[in-house]
């Protein structure tokens, strides 16, 4: 039996405009978020192992590729996602070529080029830097910039998820500005880590430790300046405090709400709730070396004996989705045609 999964849903109270009653956010406005559960260890994603920082960094840093809301890989700083079909991946699958957009500038006005990508790669694999993981980058045998807008990577061996890891959504580290960071033996303690210069839609203005991080719209952003002038991310570890600040209007939006607090959030007048799928799976894994569990009928009987829907409803207050695979239900890899195993204790007994 395929391991069963419960897909919980995150609560995102409106990056696109959820607010307290009577508040309208238009161009030139400021949004205050309860977006960080703890103090970041660094604002440089290369040196961070915290989910908050890695997710938050996409606001001010840039990557070669990113994922859309269906988990499809799409280009960001790269002009296109390298594939066999478009020639970005060689027939032997050992050479990957990226063509960099020519209209991208760092937040200080300098152009972002292929040399920045090569520099950032060398920073990640530098053993002196305290990088959490080098998965994907460790597979690189050689890398070179061809002019200002082409990066050619040669792999040591075939590594199918390489494009997802190399300055992509699964990897560690964003593209960093060589002109600001060259010459350091390591990057562990440079001032850049507290106020990075990136190429994302917003730029870091101020980090008030223990309180908040303030970002301003980047007027040089290659997709155009964001319509929201300023974002303030409050650092609020206690979920109940986050809830009360949403209720009082001290914050405009609240991400990743604990499902146990969902009934209280729903009771706040004027608050819009957006439920978005996240890859948060709860499942049982079977030890197939066990003689009993090696029998598919035993595994199926166990699955049929668990009332997953009741568990899911109780745990998520109706915000979860029951799925029958180990992939998010909105992703390209999810197989919606799988026949669900339904709760059936009597049927389970007949299998044994």
Regions found by a protein language model. Give the residues of each.
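C-terminal motif of bacterial Sec signal peptides marking the signal peptidase cleavage site
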Residues: 16-17
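Short, well-ordered beta-strand elements
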Residues: 28-38, 79, 94-98, 120, ...
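N-terminal lobe/hinge region of extracytoplasmic solute-binding protein
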Residues: 34-90, 122, 195-199
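Gly/Pro-rich hinge or "lid" segments in bacterial periplasmic/extracellular proteins
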Residues: 68-70, 169-226, 230, 240, ...
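Aromatic- and charge-enriched surface segment that lines or borders ligand/interaction sites
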Residues: 81-130, 146, 152-154, 245, ...
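Surface-exposed binding/hinge segments that line
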Residues: 134-182, 206
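Ligand-site clamp/hinge motif
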Residues: 190, 218-264, 300
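Append "and occasionally in soluble cytosolic enzymes with long acidic Gly/Pro-rich linkers
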Residues: 214-219, 294-352
């Amino acid at each position: 039996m395929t391991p069963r999964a419960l897909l919980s849903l995150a609560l995102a109270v409106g990056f696109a405009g959820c607010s307290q009653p009577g508040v309208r956010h238009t161009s030139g406005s400021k949004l205050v978020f309860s977006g960080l559960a703890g103090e970041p260890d660094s604002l440089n994603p290369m040196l961070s192992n915290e989910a908050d920082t890695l997710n938050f960094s996409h606001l001010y840093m840039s990557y070669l590729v990113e994922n859309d809301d269906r988990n499809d890989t799409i280009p960001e700083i790269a002009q296109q996602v390298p594939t066999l079909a478009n020639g970005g991946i060689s027939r032997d699958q050992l050479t990957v070529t990226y063509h960099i957009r020519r209209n991208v500038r760092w937040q200080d006005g300098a152009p972002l080029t292929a040399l920045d990508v090569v520099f950032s790669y060398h920073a990640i694999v530098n053993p002196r830097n305290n990088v959490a993981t080098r998965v994907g980058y460790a597979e690189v045998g050689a890398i070179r910039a061809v002019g200002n807008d082409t990066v050619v990577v040669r792999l040591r061996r075939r590594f199918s998820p390489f494009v997802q890891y190399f300055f992509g959504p699964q990897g560690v580290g964003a593209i960093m500005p060589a002109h600001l960071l060259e010459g350091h033996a390591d990057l562990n303690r440079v001032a850049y880590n507290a106020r990075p210069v990136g190429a994302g839609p917003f730029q870091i203005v101020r980090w008030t430790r223990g309180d908040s991080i303030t970002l301003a719209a980047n007027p040089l952003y290659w997709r155009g300046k964001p319509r929201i002038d300023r974002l303030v991310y409050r650092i609020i570890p206690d979920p109940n405090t986050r809830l009360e600040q949403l209720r009082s209007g001290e914050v405009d939006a609240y991400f990743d709400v604990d499902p146990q607090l969902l009934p209280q959030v729903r009771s706040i007048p004027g608050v819009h709730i957006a439920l978005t799928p996240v890859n948060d799976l709860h499942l049982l894994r079977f030890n197939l070396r066990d003689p009993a569990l090696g029998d598919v009928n035993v595994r199926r009987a166990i699955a049929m004996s668990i009332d997953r829907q009741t568990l899911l409803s109780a745990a998520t207050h109706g915000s979860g989705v029951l799925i029958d695979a180990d992939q998010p239900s909105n992703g390209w890899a999810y197989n919606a045609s799988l026949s669900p195993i339904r709760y059936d204790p009597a049927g389970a007994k007949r299998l044994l």
